[in-house]
From Swiss-Prot:
GO terms for molecular function: electron transfer activity. Glycans are attached at N59, N85. May act as a carbohydrate transporter. It comes from Arabidopsis thaliana (Mouse-ear cress). This is Early nodulin-like protein 4. InterPro entries: Cupredoxin, ENL_dom, Phytocyanin-like, Phytocyanin_dom.
Amino acid sequence: MVFVKMTDVYLMIVMLMGLGFSIELSNGHKFYVGGRDGWVLTPSEDYSHWSHRNRFQVNDTLYFKYVKGKDSVLEVSEKEYNTCNTTHPLTSLSDGDSLFLLSRSDPFFFVSGNSGSCLKGQKLAVTVMSTGHHSHTPRHPSPSPSPSASPVRKALLSPAPIPVHKALSSPAPTPGVDPSHSEVLAPAPGPAAAVRNLAGSVAPGVISLGLVLVIMISSMV
């Protein structure tokens, strides 16, 4: 009987963790097109540059802010995007506060409802990555790490973290620290962090509940 109860509890933990993973994946990121400027003809950052430096994933949303009645957002095909043809949109948004769900891993193309504005550059193309990616890090390349930074992974796998000053001063090829990776030398993550690495990310509340149940089971044995 005790074995059956413990099995049920373990099954519940697995189900809760799976539920948390599903909830986390369904909560996409909200991107504000044009930033503070909104969906305008001349934003402070060019739309193509803004799109290039961001990573878009399935279930993310694009938020278009503009003056209702004076502009609109049209989702179009790639051909119509290139020619600024606004006569056959796939989707038309005109409420002034428009949200567009990126529901699949594909390229999406948007133009202003004013064809003249589109010809002047008010158009946006985004490419949505597959669900296998779980990061919204910018796409532009980061500065190349120094040769001494490459063994950081090895340092993480060692029983105890190597002091930063020793890693920098030692002439031997011991792990070093790049300024942009200063947080990597923190204490090795626990089981919950391992789950996040495998599954993308899991709701913290669900993990906490699972750990509490594990502790309760351990006290019963």
